[in-house]
Amino acid sequence: MKKFLSLVLSVLMLMSAFSVAAWALDEELVITVVNDLHYNLTYTKKATKANSINADFAHIGNASRLPHEAIAIIKGFLSEAAENESQAVIIPGDITDGGKKNEVKGIVELFSKFEAETGKQIYAVPGNHDYYNLKVTPEKFKNDYFEFGYDEAIEIDDDTASYVVDLSDEYRLIAIDSCVPGEGRHGIDSSRLEWIKAQGEKAKADGKKLIGMHHQNLLEHMIFSGVIQPGGVVTAKDKSAAEVYAKAGIKYVFTGHTHDHDIASYTAADGTVIYDAVTGSLNGCYAPYRVVTFGDSVKFETRGVQKIDTSLLPEGISANAVALAESNFPEYTKIATDLSYRLVFNQYTTAKGLKGVLKLEDEEMNAIIDKVGNRLNEALNMPLYKENETEEGKSIEAIVEKYQTFLPETEYKDMIDLAVTIYQAHNIGDESFPAYSDEVIILTRGLAAVLSYALAEVSAEEYATVLNFIVDLLGVDIPVNFTSYTGSAVKRFEGAEILVTTVALPLVADFTTDPAPGDCNVTLPGYAELVEEEPSFFEKIIAFFRMLLDTVRTMFAFVPSWNK
């Protein structure tokens, strides 16, 4: 009997081992993703006054990121990446701010030290900023950053700085140089797509799962991103590149460039879903990076640099700001980038700023912009509420009340304050301002008021020209004749309101409410599938007893009475 029990126990152990072997998931791969580091030695010199809005943060300019703090942030990130659970770090471009020789030397030293101390490999590709130094060619980039991917590459493209490297026994990284040296636009052309196709075929032949990375976005992550940053999105007008990625087996691609923190998806013609995960700039709000785990599913976790060595900050930053950076660095980044975006909005909503962005050849429109641009900026900076007016009637609330509507009560100071909040929410990820929120209500009514104020002194013909221009710029078609709304101030407000509600609101809604999937902490489908569908618990029990019975029959196979 003891022998029988021992045999049964052995069978159970063998069965357990068989079960684990048969149903084990793929070994996990964990990577850290960080981009748009913008390493720059220029800002290590004494910080000077760049704004008169916030005395404590007077060094903050309109860069929309934190260049003075960049080196301290990068070192803080490397310290955290050294301790986290990832096996490698991938960097989809803009490693430096301008590709200068001293910048490259400085960041290479930091990366080399990180690899030597941690044993973790860094894999990098260029961004447009890395090519801003026209002396930097793909060949030079490959030489400068040789130990960060190229040294382990199983294949390197001759014409670009693209390469392929195995991250593990199961996963292969296709690191794509998506840039055109000296320009901001992407360079994913037919020849690069052919190279991607070829790598996809090789990966399939080798049984590898392809993970992609490059600098410019593959998919659109915000409304009008293809208009706002021409050439910054590979598939802004043509989705054929996404089809190539899907067929090549690149289910996930990591990008940068736009400084958004967002995940977008695309369903190919054959039903394959691919994901483009763009990570916010490391020098942006909350200094974000991702830790991504590849297994049966793909788990995204957003983290941010929690602490920096404030002794690395340049002179000229106020003591109060340094103290905040020391005690609560995430809050420091939020205050500083909010201020920077306010400066950006103010810069581009003047006559000069609008003409610089739009670059119009239409003399009539340029003349109208000269007339209305500064009034537009004035309206955006007006107090939102009457209680804060410095001049009677000069508030957004006073304007909308003239047209029998109202604003919800909030803590926002003006329209730019609101715009910064909404824009920052998009940059941070998982933004959620539905159409019924106070923010969207104020945004739509406030924009109508701003347009009415800005266009109050133009002719009827100029008024209709501006509204039709906005409609054309946004690429929409609405059956509205704006010449019917050019008469009284009331009619002009109605025209502006129609423009906002029928054209802008649907587009704003797409920007203020994040579509699935989530952006920050989310679990998405993996590459790996079980060799066969895992049986149910009941099926496992039946299989166990069948195996047990077969074993017992085998044990007594030579007993005469069992063979009769």
Where are these regions (language model features)?
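Non-catalytic terminal accessory segments
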Residues: 2, 25-27, 314-564
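N-terminal active-site segment of His-dependent metallophosphoesterases
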Residues: 24-101
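His/acidic metal-ligating clusters that form di-metal
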Residues: 82-85, 172-174, 183-273, 378, ...
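Sec-dependent N-terminal signal peptides of Gram-positive bacterial secreted proteins and lipoproteins
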Residues: 4-22
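Active-site neighborhood of phospho(di)ester-bond hydrolases with catalytic His/Asp-centered motifs
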Residues: 33-35, 89-93, 121-128, 211-215, ...
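Extended active-site neighborhood of metal-dependent phosphoesterases/phosphodiesterases
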Residues: 101, 105-201, 269-275, 291, ...
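Solvent-exposed loop/turn segments at secondary-structure junctions
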Residues: 37-40, 95-98, 128-132, 179-183, ...
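Active-site-proximal beta-strand elements of phosphoester/diester hydrolases
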Residues: 28-41, 170-181, 213, 274-281, ...
